[in-house]
UniProtKB/Swiss-Prot annotation:
Keyword vocabulary terms for this entry: Cytoplasm, Hydrolase
Function: Probably catalyzes the hydrolysis of L-ascorbate-6-P into 3-keto-L-gulonate-6-P. Is essential for L-ascorbate utilization under anaerobic conditions.
Xref: SUPFAM superfamilies: Metallo-hydrolase/oxidoreductase
Protein name as annotated: Probable L-ascorbate-6-phosphate lactonase UlaG
InterPro entries per UniProt: L-ascorbate_6P_UlaG, Metallo-B-lactamas, RibonucZ/Hydroxyglut_hydro, UlaG-like_MBL-fold, UPF0173_UPF0282_UlaG_hydrolase
């Protein structure tokens, strides 16, 4: 049988997906985090892999799913949170625009799986399955009640799950994880299709969503999940030392308020008293596409007048950020390679060929 006859759609998918293979898995495993630092990698959306100087590995909001894949149904799902928010009927054209940079089934070394809330792009059954099948049998799954309900429903043993609410602290080796208030108002209108939100006092945010502060020996990381802007960021900034803060950024479509704007990101950073602010989530959905350079432009306009004590950092999915080594950088660039040029003699027709 010829090559073109033996190749199938399934063989094509298996040979190309996930796009990065186990490249990033291997990079994370091989990383030796220096004392006085922490390293983290952006997995897409709000997914983060954090590694401490003691070699502790935790992942937050690692999601391996996708968005719209067909025009088949032109209507939004009845009762969807965006329908409740804006009174829309048409299908939301949210296509995933980010490649899959980490293979969940190639994960071997992990000390905790965390989720900030139960929206589909922040918690993943494939990640849960991979960790249950391939990793140590004591790796905990940490999140608010709605996330634990999902994990248990998927088959994660209840005793492997830890329910957290604001004020709770969980120690995972040398990382101290503080659950803090979340400000994700979209989560409050994520309800069963037959349940009405109009005129009804929402149930508590604390069972649905949390923010996290990761205190490591080498510095502290604030993860805001899908939180909108809130005055309470200032309270968190008063109560905790925050070195790096991550905020969900995006260009909200007409009639929608679901992501922080560039101004919100700057206000969040100022309120938290962070040293570095990094936008995320803007990478993932085609209809929330936003340019993070806007944050830097506004920062340049305001930093001297408002005496900002922080810098913005523009990241790339799959890229690494090391605190404090990268604290004065403004943008990430993937490794360019070719640092070993001319270690062997080039094989060219003549020296001036190139």
């Amino acid at each position: 049988m010829s090559k073109v006859q033996s190749i199938t759609r399934e063989s094509w998918i298996l040979s190309t997906f996930p796009e990065w293979g186990s490249w990033l898995n291997e990079e994370i495993e091989q990383e030796q985090v220096a004392p006085g630092t922490f390293a983290m990698w952006w997995l897409g959306c709000t997914g983060i892999w954090l590694k401490s100087e003691g070699g502790t590995n935790v992942c937050v909001d690692f999601w391996c799913g996708t968005g719209k894949q067909s025009h088949g149904n032109p209507l939004m799902k009845t009762g969807h949170q965006m329908q409740r928010m804006a009174g829309v009927k048409k299908l939301q054209p949210n296509l995933r625009t980010t490649p899959f940079v980490l293979d969940p089934f190639a994960i071997r070394q992990i000390d905790a799986v965390l989720a900030t809330h139960d929206h589909n792009d922040h918690i993943d059954v494939n990640v849960a399955a991979a960790v249950m099948q391939n990793c140590a049998d004591d790796v905990p799954f940490i999140g608010p009640q709605t996330c634990v309900d999902l994990w248990v429903g998927w088959g994660v043993p209840k005793e492997r799950c830890i329910v957290v609410k604001p004020g709770d602290v969980v120690k995972v080796k040398d990382i101290e994880i503080h659950a803090l208030d979340a400000f994700d108002r979209t989560a409050l209108i994520t309800l069963p299709a037959d349940q009405k939100a109009a005129g009804v006092l929402p149930d508590g945010m604390d069972v649905r969503a949390v923010n996290y502060l990761f205190k490591t020996p080498g510095g502290n990381l604030y993860h805001s999940g899908d939180s909108h802007y809130s005055n309470y960021y200032a309270k968190h900034g008063n109560e905790h030392q925050i070195d790096v803060a991550l905020g969900s950024y995006g260009e909200n479509p007409r009639g929608i308020t679901d992501k922080m704007t560039s101004t919100d990101i700057l206000r969040m950073a100022e309120s938290l008293n962070t040293k570095v602010v990094i936008p995320f989530h803007h990478d993932i959905w085609s209809n929330f596409q936003a340019d993070p350079q806007e944050i830097r432009v506004l920062w340049e306009m305001k930093k001297d007048r408002l005496k900002y004590g922080f810098k913005p950092f523009i990241w790339q999915v799959g890229g690494k950020f090391t605190w404090p080594l990268d604290k004065d950088n403004f943008e990430y660039h993937y490794p360019r390679g070719f640092d070993d040029c001319f270690t062997i003699e080039p094989d060219l027709p003549f020296k001036s060929f190139l």
